[in-house]
Amino acid sequence: MVDTEDEPKDVMVLSAIAKGYNTEEKITKATGLSAFDVAIIVERLILHGLIVKREKKGFLGRRKVELTITEKGTRELQERRFELEQKWQRMVMLAEQGKRQEFEREALSMRSWIPIMLFMGIMDMMMWMTMLNMMNLAQQDYMPEQVPGAGGDMGDAGEGGGWDWGDFGDVNI
């Protein structure tokens, strides 16, 4: 892969394929990227020999396109994962040592990689927010706009009207 501004998205799509999301639709849902971006990235990954596209017969004779990662793609993904884990460990170390300026510089340089680090499970959102708070840094300056799930899922909090009656169970009004 070539170092470009699209590289984090390329790695995210490659990681999704490695996790078993083998169609463009599944990748779009899993990554939060647009269908257009996913289609372009898939073509780029095919050109680099990191994935292959196979057509299969689907339900009722419809053709189904499946994507699989190649050995070269697996090696590339392992290398990227190792690099990102090293960078994450460095940021954790800087935060623990209280080196605010170095942490800030490192965090800004990694801003576009945060979504992929979250997607791959390298970093944890709660840990990241805690580190930013420890350094007294504004969270919005270090969070890219396209982080899937960064908006905070409130779950059932929007329903309102629910009271807890202790031993009598929950009553919704």
Regions flagged by a language model, labelled:
Residues 30-48, 53:
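Short amphipathic alpha-helical interaction segments
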Residues 64-107:
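Short, amphipathic alpha-helical interaction segments positioned at domain boundaries
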Residues 90-168:
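Exposed, interaction-prone assembly regions rather than primary DNA-binding/catalytic cores
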Residues 21-30:
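Short acidic, hydrophobic short linear motifs in intrinsically disordered regions
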Residues 14-20:
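Short helix-to-turn junction characteristic of helix-turn-helix DNA-binding domains
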Residues 56-64:
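Short, Lys/Arg-rich nucleic-acid/phosphate-binding segment
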Residues 171-173:
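Long low-complexity, intrinsically disordered regions
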Residues 1-12:
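Short alpha-helical segments that sit at the start of domains
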